[in-house]
Amino acid sequence: MTYARPADRAGALRLHLNENTGGCSQAVIDAIRQITAEDVAYYPDYSALLKECAEYLGVREAQLVLTNGLDEGLLAATVNGFRVAQPAAGLPEAIVPAPAFEMYSVFVKAAGGRVISIPPKPAFEFQLREICGAVTERTRLVFLTNPNNPTGQIIPREALREVARYVPADVTVFIDEAYFDFCGETFLPEIDAHPNVIIGRTFAKAHGLAGLRAGCLIGDAGRLNDIRNVVPPYSLSVFAVAGWRAALGDRDYLGWYRTQVEESKELLYRAAGRLGLQYWKSGGNFVLINVSRVGDPADFVEAMATRGILIRDRSQDPGCGGCIRITAGLVRHTEVVIEALEGLCAAAS
């Protein structure tokens, strides 16, 4: 299995990858412009960024690993989870509740493991009993996304506790909080009580640093020491370090963009309701909408693209038949996509 990156179209409105459609803070651009030729020639120094990021998150530096995007953190956690405790027989296993971010399965298979997929429930309720029932002596990882992508559903904290308590101590429970900034739900206050939990965060979404690749892992210091043996020593560029530090200092930009996303989601909910389309309220910066009533989702996505708007076909995800996913970003962009959505629905009537 490989990750198939959705096609881009020059000049199109990008509402297909859950990026920050408002760009990044001007402070980030200003910081990058201060980089000198000497800075580029030398390997980057992470020490100040590590300190500032730990303070921003409210954790100790020993509980934090900085990564080249959250993807690098996911890969490192997967490789380490399989490396430190091989099962007596058979392939190491990772439990992945569906639907889920595709890279979990890609990384598990690349690391020589087997994916145990947990089918979704009808209303995308969290599959607590099914996850616990899938744990075997070969289980090494459990991937949980909170909120989920692509459904946007939030996992109750007590359910996360149940999983962390149920699995053996050598099993890593990876909680992917890529969309934390849009819902505020986090397991971070619980990490000292659950040393088998690793939390993944990204600064690509709300902070607008997707092009710089800025992610991190948070968890037990001992477990993260093992992961540091997997992460390259200089995987962040000097541009990422400078931009990341600047982004951490601009809380006003973060607050402004969160407000834009919340308003955009409300607009999408109301539009879908008016059009008689099923949708799910989301804890992320996106909304999942079922368009099967008015047409095939692949055709719908292509029709949007011809109008200069890129959205994502999620109809092949388990439980998501007929669904598209639309990034909720700037309100003015959302108004454009809603106008197109209304036009396509009217044409299909």
Language-model features: locations:
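N-terminal small-domain helix-loop-helix segment of the aminotransferase-like
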Residues: 1-72, 76, 348
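PLP-dependent aminotransferase class I/II
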Residues: 25, 196-280
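Short, conserved charged micro-motifs
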Residues: 26, 294-301, 333-336
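Active-site pre-lysine segment of PLP-dependent enzymes
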Residues: 54, 109, 128-137, 150-206
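PLP-dependent aminotransferase-like
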Residues: 82-144
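Conserved PLP-binding catalytic core of the aspartate aminotransferase-like
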Residues: 122, 262, 274-307, 324
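PLP-dependent enzyme catalytic core of the Aspartate aminotransferase-like
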Residues: 303-307, 316-349
